[in-house]
């Protein structure tokens, strides 16, 4: 099965599916690419989850199936793509391009009408079986690659700002200065001030991280803006996100 004229918005190097934005979160400044032709594979839920939420080698049988079957188009120029496909488990849909490697470097969602076309095309088919050993690649989440439940329900802007906050907290954790940790926990939760001075570094860190790891709020935003102050690169990322609040695509 093949899809034609597929609009994709590539997110590069994303190991977590929650950062591969769905169409309603696409922005005007995102670079949209046209896949002139791309193979469509109906696969197992386990394999789709593996592709969507990791950056490991794809099954060789899958790579062989899609080898040089996809094309991009820019103007009149049609270019072959080594390993690209749209995959679905019957519920979720994902496009990927390995950029010549064996791992899904670039990932994208589809626009709604092309998602519907995928569902229509697989309606009377069964999933293909591609052997792979998922057990050797147990997913490990950490502060800079948060578990999905910590970002569930957040918008693209909120996810990006939370990532910034986690970068700031990671630096704080690395420095592990007791007074600095106490200061930031007081900023986050002033009500804890009377007991904070009796906490050691580990207790302060645990209280701070446990306090901020779930969800997103104006308090998270305030803490993030203060924590990254004076760090030019992080401040630029902050300003870019704050300016992107309403920038979503009108692509149909």
Curated annotation (Swiss-Prot):
The similarity comment for this entry is: Belongs to the UPF0736 family.
InterPro entries linked? UPF0736
Against Pfam families, the record matches this protein to: DUF3603
Top-rank lineage group of the source organism: Bacteria
Q: By what name is this protein known?
A: UPF0736 protein OB1207
